[in-house]
Each structure stands twice: as structure tokens, then as C-alpha cells.
Amino acid sequence: MQFGRAIAALAGIACALPVVIATPLERRFFGSHEEPRDVKWDTNHFTVAAGLCQATYCPSTKVGSKVGDDAKLLWYKGDGDDVQRALIFHSKTLGITVALEGTNTSSMVSTANDVFAVPVDVDYRFKDSVPKGAQLMFGFQDAYLKVADDVAKMVPKFKKEYNESRLTITGHSLGAAMGLVAAGHLQKVIHGGVHEVILFGLPRAGNKIYADWFDKTFGDRFHFIVNGHDWVPHVAPRILGYRQVSNQIWINPANSTNWKFYPGQENVHGCDSVVPEWGSFDDHQGVYFHTQIGASLGHCPATIGQD
């Protein structure tokens, strides 16, 4: 596991070099200057989503098991090695929820998804839904495509079984990047589309064309949460054309209850305003809305709102 963590950290640092050498003026040029605001949404949604993200890191989570008093696991696919885990829950708070696993740093295959930073066209499954020129990072899209068809098949089944109209997508780290891809795909192929998208520790996963389309499509149905000085949301680098989406919620200091909403893409007052802790996973695997998420630091069995 330490080797995998080292590879992931080195890859992140390599991707970050263009960010590190950029001047403060260059960094400010890219982003929104809107002032931070109070978080007006029901933060219990974020707390529950964090618990379901944590469950993806727990191989012992079996069909029928519960996460807190809120959610029951209905289906899963993936071994966390060749295929990232994709879990489908029925949640009282979030409805039918797809939770996607973050990087398994003991797996070279899983870690490789974070390294293949080549931008590629959006997959044929939903390419005609996005503007021409929209691109995603190869490793993130490829990781999702290994579970995409099965997820798209099972979601309607469970929506019907539970008489549920809501579909929520969540994920942490690599799982968050996969969630950004999944939202685009499932918005097209699932009747009623996606109700809510909540992502934690989200890397830059697409280019500006994709980010603009995503913002327009999902609006306030989407939020991503950054914890403290986490470096992951600062990669892949903008010099390769990647752009962070809007609707950042930044927890600062890390693991605290001090959170604010930062409108617009790459908001200069948000996490871009501090120097990330390159190579450290402490904030990345931190406490998000009273729930810790992380392969090594989070709880198994997963809990909701206990931190």
C-alpha cells in the first residue's frame, strides 16, 4: 500500500508542477472572483453522502447491509483492483444513490487511473449530449466505463422497485472524478435524469467545455467539497486544458465545521487561495460534514455523522 501511495503522491506532484510555478497573478486570472457565501443547502445530504462514499472503501460491505439508519446496499460491482467498486444504495435522504470508490493505493491498476492524464473525447454513450470539443481525462473516464453499463441497467430497476424518483451520485477522490463522468452519462440514459451530485476531494476531470456544460446542466443540483489544504482538487493541471467545475464548498480549516460556498469555476477565494499540502493525504482523507472518508483513515463498517 505504501508503494501505491508513493506512486499516487508522485504523480500528483508531477501534475502539480505547472500549478506550483504559476505566479499568483496567473492563478487569479483563471478563476471566479465572487465572494464566498454561507452554505444554504441541507448539509445532512453531504453528511449522508460522505458515509456512502466511505462504504466503497469497505470490502466487507455486503448487499443488504446498512450504513447508519439511512441507507441499505442494494447492489455492487468491482473488486477495487481491476475494477473500481460501484455501489448502489437506497437512501432515505438521497434516494437511489450510486457511490463510486476512490483510489485503492495497493492496486497498480487503480492507481494508474490517476496517472493517465491524457484528455480524450467524451465516450459515445453520451457524447451527443455534450458540446463539440468536450473532453475528459482518460484514466477517470476509463475507470467509470468499466461499470457504466451495469450501473445504467440496475438504477432503473431499483428506482421502480422502491418507487423512487431521485437519483444521486457521489464519490471521493478517483470516485469523485468517476462521478463527474457518471453524472453526464446517467443524466442522458436514465429517465428523469440525475437529482443530485455530491463529490468529495474532486480532481479536475474535464476541460473547460465539459466544465461549462456540466455547470449549465446541473446547476445547484451539484456540489463538490474540498477539505483544508487537500492537493487532489488542484490536479490534473490547467496547462493540459483541465478546468475545475463550479459550486465548490471549502472546509477550512480542515476537518472543521467552518465551511463556505464559493461560486463559479476555480474561485480565487476558495481552495486555490492556499498552498496545497503536496503529497500528504491527511486532509484528503479527512472529516467531511462530521464523517471521515478514506481508504486508510475512514471507518469500516462505514458510519454517518459520527466524527
Name these PLM-found stretches:
Residues 52, 98, 147, 197, ...:
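A residue-level signal for conserved active-site and pocket-lining positions in enzyme catalytic cores
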Residues 21-106:
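Flexible, membrane-associating and regulatory peripheral segments of lipid-active enzymes
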Residues 70-169, 189-194, 216-220, 307:
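A conserved cap/lid and substrate-binding interface adjacent to the catalytic center
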Residues 1-26:
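Fungal secretory targeting signals
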Residues 211-307:
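Lipolytic serine-hydrolase domain surface
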Residues 9, 15, 46, 51, ...:
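Residue-level signal for mature regions of secreted extracellular proteins and peptides
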Residues 152-242:
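Serine-dependent carboxylesterase/thioesterase catalytic core
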Residues 15, 93-94, 103-105, 174, ...:
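Conserved beta-strand elements of beta-rich interaction domains across eukaryotes
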